[in-house]
Structure formats: C-alpha cells, structure tokens
Amino acid sequence: MSKKVERKGSFKSISGDELKDFYSSSNNEKNYNIDPGSFPYTRGIHKNMYRGKLWTMRQFSGFSTPEKTNERYKYLLKNGQTGLSVAYDMPTLMGYDPDHELSSGEVGVCGVNVASLQDMEILFDGIDLEKISVSQTINGPAIILFAFYVALAKKNGIDVSKLRGTLQNDALKEYMAQKEWIFPPEPSVKLVVDIIEYCSENMPLYNPVSISGYHIREAGSTAAQELAFTLNNGFAYIEECLERGLKIDDFAHRLSFFFNAHMDFFEEIAKYRAARRIWANRLKDKYGAKNESSLKLKFHTQTAGCSLTAQQPENNIVRTAFEAMSAVLGGTNSLHTNSLDETLALPSEKAAKIALRTQQILAFETGVPNVADPLGGSWYIEELTDKLEKHAIRYFEEIQEMGGTVQAIEDGYFQKKIAESASIYQESVDSKERIIVGVNDFVEEDEELDIEILKISRDAQDTQEDKIKTLRKSRDEKTLQEKMKKLSDACKKDLNLVPFLIEVAEQGGTVGEIVEVMKKVYGEWEESFGI
C-alpha cells in the first residue's frame, strides 16, 4: 500500500498531543452510554440541557467611572443580555484608592473604578439586584468588594438571601497566572473561606467563588494544565472549608468554575466534559458528597482573549464565534464572548453589541442548543475526554507529592509549567508550525486600522479623585476608625471578616484604606524564584 501524503509532518492538539488520522471504537465505551443529567455528568448536568434553559449571556464589562459603566450595563440589558459581569480597573484589583500615587494613569483604563460603597451604589443605580445576577471579577480585595455589594443590598432593603451572582474570589490562581495578589497565599485562602462560610449561612443562592482556569490558560498553559490546575485549586478550597468545620454539602453546590474557550475546537469540548466527570467522581469518592447538586460542576466560559489578534481585527469575530460554539457544545452554564477590538482597547459599544449578537445567533439560529451533548459518542471526542482526564490526574499526583497547592506555588511549580507551555506554543507560531491568520500567514502588509477605538478620558481619574476626597470630608471619621479597629482585631483573632467589613463599608471606608489595615496584620507576598 502506498504511503499517504499529508499536508503536514504531524498533527497535534494545542496541548501537544499527537492526533490520529481518524478515531474508531474504544475499549472504554461503557463510559459513553450514560445520559446527560446522569452521574458523573460527562454529558451535562441537566438531562435536557439548553432545551430547558439557555446559558446566561453574561458580557464582562466595566470602564471609566461607575456612572459610565452603569450606562453600558443598561445598554447591554436593553439589547438582551441576561446577567451582568463587572470588570474592575487595575487600582481596584490591586487594592489602591484612585488618589494613590500608583493609581495615576490607570483609573478606569482597563475596567471600572470602585473605591467605596458610594461608587457601588452608582454602579448599580436603577438595576434590580433581586432580578439580575451579577458576577464580579475581583480577587485580592474580593472580600472588600463583596462587603460593599452586601452593604448596598441591605441599604436598598433587599433580603441578601435572595441575591444571585458570583464572586470570582479565586486567590490561588493569582499566584499561578494573573499576578494580582495582595496578601500571602495562606491568609488569602483564609479570606476565600470566610466568604464561602458567610454565603453558606446567609446567601444560599450566591456563588462565593469562581475557581478560574481562564487566567491560567491566558498565561500560556495547555488545555490539560488549565483543567488540572483549576480543579486542583477547587479541591484545595474544599480542604480548607472542611478544616474550618463546614460540611461538604453545605457549600460544595455553590462552588463555581470559570474556563477558557480556546481555538482547538474539539479539545475544548473534551476539556469541559472531563472537568465535570473528574469533579463528580472526586466529590463523591473522596469527600463523601451526597447532595446531587454538589456533584454537578457548574461553569462560566469566556472566549480566549489570547487568541485574538491586533492584525485584521474583524477576523476576531469569527474566532470568537467558533470558541463560543465549543463552549456551548461542551455544556457551559454562562458565556462571555470577546469583542473584536479587545487587543487594542476596551470594547466600543458597537463591538460589545456584535459580541452579544454572536451569542444570540448561536442560541436562536444555529440549532446547536436543541440537543443535549450532540457530540457525545463521537469516538474522537470520547477519547480526547479520557486523555485529558488522565493528564489531569497525573498533575494532581505531582502536586500532592510536592506537598500540596500552597507549597507548589511557593516552589514555582505552576508558574514554571505554564511558562514552559507558553514558550512551546510561541515557538510553534514563530516557526509557522501553527498558523495564525493575519499574523504569520495571509498577512496584509499595508493594513490600515479602520475600526472605532474606545478612548478613556483623563476625566475618569479626576472624577474619582474628587469623589473620594469629598467622601473623606463628609463621613463620620471617629465612628469609621472605631470600625477599622474592630476589623484589625478580627484579623488578628482569625475571625470571619465579612461582618466587620460590611460595617466599615457602611461608614465610608475605602478599598485602599481597608487594604492597608489588613496588610499590617497579614503582610504582603513576593515571588522568590525565577522562571
């Protein structure tokens, strides 16, 4: 038989696995006959999936001042968005007030600036928080922004037990990938558990943490590493909650996840399926979860920002559409589709609408949501799912051998693995082994940018600085300092900080002021290794 001629020397997934030229029946077919909605939920957590309820269309948005972002939220809701997702700016993410010297030039640039309860009120003015679920992407100072949100609900007479939404609040991935930590790993994990504990007792409909693989993938990991490191972080939080004395079925059903949808279409679908299966089996076998809801992994997906290109930016609409489809075929519970201009600026109003319309076309025109897990039983998809599960389990074992997650962070294990994978990927692009249209092939040498770019006015910095100065003059400073002292004492006594932070928020305490009080007890952290 003559040798087949193929267009490349080898075919690999983005994770680096060699791909066969075709896939046929497997010895593991017993796993493939399980229906959607049945343990271990490989095929989806609901029997009828999107036939019953479509995924939540939750576009990540925030820029400039709370007033400007509030206008954008109302625009998105008017155009059919079904949930809100807050993007904070760098000063807020790092725990600085807008008038801090390190905030200069950064206020409102990559998200909305929120420094106080007053800002939170403006951000959600005219939005019914009992009806709209709100996701907040905040980590280092997550417990502070959470306290602002709860204080706002109470001020508006809302029963907090009715609040729906998600707080990202995933400290561990900050040290691995996002690099926006404030405190050392151990106290940061303690703060995560504080919020989980508070929500389990007071806010049963709220997801207190969104364990995030998205940033791990954006930093350069493979799909297998994203899967493994993310689930491993989830297990680490479970261990801390159990040590606190919480019962597994009192909180596990509110743990949520956040994954990336990259360009390797079938590998991404398999990744989501493997995540559900691993989670269900581990929660049942290791942690003894009995509540069916605890076994069902729920996740949000965002299309891959790192796959977008500044060159020929209109092509990003197509990339995003394929990535969104992989997320839906993989059973995501909510979805953000990136805008075509995000390599160049925060999304313009037009670009944000196109991104939302991409989801709506997928939901209402393609027929994709009409059948649960339509790719289930595909020999290719099932073998990919099995392979990713095996990769993940191998990583779990390595991390355990190193002494657990925090020790592996301090030793630089995750950071080095991600850096190695990022380097391999970039080499494949540089060598043209992997083609990126418009970047290393099909290039337009004389390309001119002709899309609208959103520009953030310097007025955002001035406005936020003026607001915080006015706040400091108008608040009851004596009462605030009394509440700050109680907060400091609670830090030292290892108490749950949420009630103390709500009191500080109500008295006009700012993000930066609160962080400084907490730093004096918890300290700060610096990486002590090189990559």
Segments predicted by a language model, with ranges:
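Generic secondary-structure signature for well-ordered alpha-helical cores
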Residues: 82, 125-129, 151-159, 193-205, ...
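Flexible, glycine-rich loop/tail regions that form catalytic "lids" or insertion modules at the edges
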Residues: 2-28, 35, 39-42, 90, ...
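Active-site capping/gating regions of soluble enzymes
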Residues: 212, 228-237, 253-438
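Conserved active-site and cofactor/substrate-binding residues in soluble primary-metabolism enzymes
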Residues: 36, 64-71, 114-118, 140-147, ...
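Catalytic alpha/beta active-site cores
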Residues: 1-262, 267, 286, 293-300, ...
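Short, structured secondary-structure boundary patches
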Residues: 105-108, 182-186, 355-357, 428-431, ...
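Catalytic or ion-translocation cores adjacent to nucleophile or general acid/base/metal-coordination motifs
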Residues: 160-162, 191, 346, 528-531
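Short Asp/Glu-rich motifs
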Residues: 95-96, 172, 345-347, 418, ...
